[in-house]
Amino acid sequence: MPVNLKGRSFLTLKDFTPDEIRYMLNLAADLKAKKRAGIRGNLLAGKNIVLLFEKTSTRTRCAFEVAAYDEGAHVTFLDSKSSQMGKKETMVDTAKVLGRFFDGIEYRGYDQKVVEGLAANAGVPVWNGLTDVDHPTQALADILTLMENTKKPLNKCKLVFCGDTRNNVAYCLMYICAKLGMHYVGWGPKELAPAADVVAYCKEVAKETGAIVEYGEDRALLKGADALYTDIWASMGEEDKIPERVKQLTPYKVTGEVLAATENSDCIFLHCLPSFHDFDTTMAASQKELSYDIREVTDEVFLSPNSKVFDEAENRMHTIKAVMVATIGNV
């Protein structure tokens, strides 16, 4: 049966079947090939989309804007300073207004309930650009990058997330790996283990797809990985958590030794970015002066041929384009 996602919101990968996820990945690969060939599309011609940002980003904003422009859409950007949502206007009212103006709404912020509320009230597709508990467009880009760098079918691939295994990126990777029958490992300290309800959901899905979902502290879990993944240990505004995070997560830093422990010379390294892989940022340098090394990955890995982080960043644009085309496109 053909996949039809027209009119659907994209809030979490939990809402989509394995076939629907594969459809979006294959569509992204096709759109990427056409862009590389210089074929300009018009699949979003006449469409108006709004980007609603409560939390800043480089990749998400640029990916949505370029993807939309590539296919002929018009884009409006609203941040917390240029929107009254939650201040002088309720989220419900904002959703109803934006739904009258736009064909699709992207939201990037904090609370998953906000993006769900927008989708429930806007009357048009709403796309999750990131919340505190999910980052579904990122997971699509991650898996597309893995597809481009392995000869294995996805259900034979093993992905290991290193570090804080209960953050939003780890969760969206758990969901997509479970849906696609992959082997997911969360390698990190037990005090930062994924929430029980997330694990239970993924293991229930795995019963249908044949996926393996596990987590733990043992370095033996790295063996056979096709991809190692990590994320920063603390974001801006979380400086007070750095001493504790450095103590907890330094044993799970992605180093050359950790990469070698996979025993797979073709294992790729992935990261959602931004990354602290050196001390050339203000935050990393200032923390180094306080004797805290906040690098979650070393340059030995980040700059190695195994690292596909910039291909992965580009793939944000192609997968986001696929989501928009699939849900509001002229197809």
Task: Go through each PLM region and give its residues.
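Short, structured coil segments at secondary-structure junctions
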Residues: 101, 121-123, 180, 265, ...
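Phosphate-coordination loops involved in phosphoryl transfer and adenosine-cofactor binding
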Residues: 44-49, 155-157, 266
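Rossmann-like adenosine-cofactor binding region
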Residues: 204-298
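Glycine-rich phosphate/diphosphate-binding loop of Rossmann-like nucleotide-binding domains
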Residues: 53-66, 148-231
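C-terminal helix-to-coil terminal segments
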Residues: 283, 288-331
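Phosphate/diphosphate ligand-binding glycine-rich loop within oxidoreductases
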Residues: 38, 42-147
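Positively charged, low-complexity intrinsically disordered leader regions
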Residues: 1-62, 66
